[in-house]
From Swiss-Prot:
Belongs to the LeuD family. LeuD type 1 subfamily. It holds the Pfam family Aconitase_C. It comes from Bordetella parapertussis (strain 12822 / ATCC BAA-587 / NCTC 13253). This is 3-isopropylmalate dehydratase small subunit 1. Catalyzes the isomerization between 2-isopropylmalate and 3-isopropylmalate, via the formation of 2-isopropylmaleate. Its EC number is 4.2.1.33.
Amino acid sequence: MQAFTQHEGLVAPLDRENVDTDLIIPKQFLKSIKRAGFGPNLFDELRYLDHGEPGMDNSKRPLNPDFVLNQPRYQGASVLLARKNFGCGSSREHAPWALTQYGFRAIIAPSYADIFFNNSFKNGLLPIVLGELEVARLFDEVKAFPGFKLNIDLERQVVIAPDGRELGFDIEPFRKYCLLNGLDDIGLTLRQADKIRAFEAERLARHPWLESRPVA
């Protein structure tokens, strides 16, 4: 998992509440459990004018010119600004997969659905919670100033706006540690590899009959 320490990125505003996981990545794209290939279908129903299905050549599909991610000024955005209750609905982990594979490193919103919030951390996506008034102000600024960027300093737990104001946010220490060090569940387990091997060796020495052996 890619570590997250500090990130400056272009902001894209998704100005709607209660964005659910089926809108983030529609159900027909969930047949694969491989963590690859979901970015082109992020917000598929909003992004394209036709109905998307797995295997379609997205480069030939008609784009919705009114959707924020299709507008030239937001191309290359890596910070998503959203409204309250982002990520509600079913608990599909494909939602943060699609967001990160598109290129987003962080989301800023007043609130999130719990399962989406937890899944985001496990996949290197930083979900930042700011107050509704501050989020509303950011929406106004993003829309008013093309090229609007935010600097996110995870170590200091602040979002730095172009005018220099710093917006503090909370994060659990363990989640912060994992993001700073690029550790997902597998990475955390591998940090205990020596202890795991030592336990297995001791177990085998004490209970050798538990080890399966080929029949002669």
